[in-house]
Amino acid sequence: CWDKDILDYCGISEMNLGKVSWPATIVGEVSADAAKETGLCAGTAVVAGSADHIASAFSAGISKPGDMLVKLGGAGDILCCLDNLEVDERLFLDYHVIPGLYLINGCMATSGSIIKWFRENLAGDFDYEELETKGENIPAGSEGLVLLPYFLGEKTPINDPKARGMLMGLTLHHKQEHIYRAILEGISFGFLHHINVFKELNISPNSARLTNGGARSRLWKKITADVLEIPVEVVSNHPGSSLGAAFIAGKATGVFSSWEEIDRFIEIGETIDPDPEVSEIYKELFCIYREIYKRNKDVFEKLWEIST
């Protein structure tokens, strides 16, 4: 299962690596020594799990082809379930925990972390609720502000570590609430960029589920629906990857008999539908968003050279 070319390039022997196993495979048991160190019972099954983002998607109900998850966390993850292999260098591709399924996915290096940075450095005395309320009173498009959310470079889909964050269109008219809304819109444009790549691969999700801290933001949820032009379902009380990992262990040890039983632990809250008129505004702004990056790519390269 290990890639020989990569191992040879790194000078690593396959003998030094563990055996690759499918999720929900019992690969051993807790030894007596490990039991003393951890407090677990000796003989407890040790089960192969999955990557955290895969377990998190599974535990949000992303388990049928076309299901899509948008994670509004410190970074921004977007995952779509497939029953066939679609390989594209702009995206990541992982096995699902369910045999025969895959998760094509992307990760934006910064998402909610930009909001945290703004709140701590530029928002003055405003708390998050005040920013929400004021941001809701700003029209879609933030009155001419467009943000590139590349504050740590960017992973997918542009794969450009030299890209930088950018706020285009500032005037003396703009206030903190304009910038706050522009941040949410810029992050949502990043997710839309991923969906456009999905569509190039003939993957067309028609709805999305939202999780993580950003799913508690009234404004961010609404902007996400309007920018993506699809209904978004909010997963309530989602514990993240821990639920997925626990279920995988339970499936391996006979607590659960089918993968579908995960559904009984998933609670869907509100569903937010896009506003067609607002979506039209965002379509035009997304084109500008993409143009800003393309026209400044060489500038980002020069800034990289100066700062390193």
Regions flagged by a language model, labelled:
Residues M15-P23, I104:
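A glycine-/small-polar-enriched, mobile loop at the entrance of the PLP active site in fold-type I
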Residues C1-C10, I26-G28, A32-T308:
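Active-site core segments that coordinate phosphate-bearing ligands/cofactors
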